[in-house]
Amino acid sequence: VYFGSCIQYFKNYKSFLKIIFKKKPKYILFSGTSFFYNSINKDTLVVKQTNILPSTVYLFFFNYKNFINFFDHCGYKLVSSTKNDTTKVNYKNFKPYLQKVKYLDLLFKKK
């Protein structure tokens, strides 16, 4: 299953992913997704996307550790985590609140 830079726009992403897990795909790939590494005790942060003005779009930044743990709990292990260089994403405006945010591709494999 391939999520091409879209899961961050799903309002109920965990419910949707649980439906996907029931299908038991061998691999699940996420590309172009923003993850934060701070010690903020939240699964997600909601941010406003401003590069498509005049439209207003909100999306999730995912807590990297919690996202990986959610998949592990649901029977999937992370086999690859790589920086996505297709788009230059500037996260500087989130400092000092978020020190480390990355635009990543993640590949999970069924255990």
Locate each region found by the language model.
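A short SAM/SAH-binding and catalytic strip from SAM-dependent methyltransferases
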Residues: 1-13
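Acidic, Ser/Thr-rich peripheral helices and adjacent loops at domain boundaries
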Residues: 44-60
